[in-house]
Amino acid sequence: MLEITDLLIAFDPATGVRRPVCRAEIAQRLLAEGETRAATAVQRLPAVDGLLDDDYVDRLLVSVHCEIQRLSEEFRHGARMAALIDPILNAMRASGLRGPYRVVDIGCGTGYVVRWLSRNAASPDVEYVGVDYNEALVREAERLARAENLHCSFVAADAFGLRDPAHILVSTGVLHHFPAADLGRFFASHEADTTVGYVHIDFQPSKIAPLGAWLFHRTRMRLAISRFDGIQSARRAHQPELIGRAAATHAPSFENWILGQRVRHTPLPCVLTSVIGVRRSLADETTAAFGGRARALEPMT
């Protein structure tokens, strides 16, 4: 399953340089998936000599991410992330690891989570950094941070290749963009010496998730691309068990947990689930910092 926004922009994997995108090629890929309406929407996008207009695509992606922020606000992504990274930070402090601690948001988009954390969970020993390949999204994140007078930073780069690497890696709504076969490589990248912990929040697949996504995006999103991609996100989300196996196999230095598979005291699936990991040497301190919530942490094997 494909999302339109995943196809509108491409980068050279070796250099990170942006590459031209052929409009007809991505429309054909969508048609091959049976997504006629999505292909038609792509065919209407401005192009020069058959190649998508980069400036238009950048403006479109910023607009889409502005709409995505509505989802982030309603699902309290900022507060949700703060509640999950705070125990890891406290465990690092308790163990004697000295700050500043660098929290890096992978695929930050326009930086909602980083900006929320900077505004509501600021600490002298914590740095919040948002990273995204798309320079237009990074510029918009920087503009919004300046407007809010926030002390955080944003970088157009590979989150795993930063000059000042992360101590805690986080993301929201990113895991489902990776094919299942690439999840192992993603988690293997967490094995860098500097990485102490991670928190990745994403949609949880279920029979009712596509319907819920359709209702939400029909009522909250104006852009057709936002509506289409939102439903696709719910449809292509990975099962927590699959994510758990990838993390346990490819990030063996970490104690890995899943949180939030079921609504409390019911068999109903949560809309979002969280994958959490810390170095094994910090596992006891982290579970202690979670307090009573530690009972809800399910080990991943």
Residue ranges and their predicted role:
Residues 170:
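A conserved beta-strand element that flanks and buttresses the S-adenosyl-L-methionine
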Residues 194-204:
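Conserved beta-strand signature within the Rossmann-like core of class I S-adenosyl-L-methionine
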Residues 203-251:
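C-terminal alpha-helical "lid/dimerization" subdomain adjacent to the S-adenosyl-L-methionine
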